[in-house]
Regions:
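Active-site-proximal binding-pocket segments
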Residues: 72-79, 88-135, 145
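Flexible, glycine/charged-enriched surface loops at secondary-structure junctions
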Residues: 1-5, 43-49, 73-75, 93-96, ...
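Accessory "access/gating" subregions that flank catalytic or transport cores
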Residues: 1-88, 95-98, 102, 212
Length: 230
């Protein structure tokens, strides 16, 4: 309805042609997330891990670990269990619904789950797993839900790509820092989501699954200016 074009295949092909290995990794991981999320935008079958709007994050990391990094399937299963635990804690103590808690509740939790999956699949110590999950969740706090025209397409599809990259970044930091010096615990960040949820609740009708939030508002203004100039 908003004439959105698929970009996953183009992003993947161009990323594979990049001469820098690091950029190829980011580009291909983003493409995996875009591909899965675009399926959700089309109304096709997806895995809600934890939601439809965030359905591109976990599949992107699983695909990257299995098909690119050749991680053993049993390690993936163990990682999925860790991801499920993270998702359960976030749901039990706050929410997974963007309509209730903003996009931090969907992309944020999906990224946190994916970070825990990566760390577990690579046999990281439990503290590193926790730190990775915490970092991924922390850096989505306050993210609003404001889909353009009410469809789970813009900015939702690209946010899945960013959520996947953030998950890998969170694991990279957690696995290389001194784990015991990580200042914020996962539990503290989950509780911080309750504070953010309260702020979003106060502004309900603008930043939580509406067509009156930041992205939709700026889009409408741009269309209005274009109409006036013509």
């Amino acid at each position: 309805p908003i004439k959105l074009h698929s970009k996953a295949a183009t992003v993947y092909k161009r990323a594979m042609d990049d001469k820098f290995q690091g950029d190829r990794g980011i580009g291909t991981l983003s493409a995996f997330a875009l591909a899965a999320s675009e399926e959700n935008g089309r109304g096709h079958l997806v895995i809600t891990a934890p939601t439809g709007g965030s359905a591109g994050v976990m599949p992107a990391l699983v695909y990257a670990l299995v098909e690119v990094r050749k991680v053993d399937n049993q390690k993936i299963r163990e990682g999925m269990l860790a991801a499920a635990a993270v998702g359960y804690l976030c749901k039990h103590h706050a929410t997974l619904s963007a309509a209730e808690g903003g996009c931090q509740a969907e992309i944020g939790v999906a990224s946190s789950m994916a970070a825990a999956l990566i760390a577990t699949a690579y046999d990281a110590p439990s503290l590193v797993v926790e730190n990775a999950a915490e970092s991924a969740l922390e850096h989505h706090l306050g993210m609003t839900c404001d889909p353009v025209a009410g469809y789970v397409q813009v900015p939702c599809i690209e946010r899945c790509a960013f959520g996947a990259v953030k998950a890998w970044t969170a694991y990279g930091i957690a696995s290389n820092e001194i784990a015991a010096r990580h200042r914020i615990s996962f539990d503290e960040t989950v509780l911080a989501r309750l504070v953010s949820l309260g702020l979003i609740e106060q502004s309900r009708g603008r930043y939580s699954a509406t067509q009156r939030g930041t992205m939709e508002l700026t889009r409408r203004k741009a269309l209005l200016r274009s109409h006036r100039s013509s």
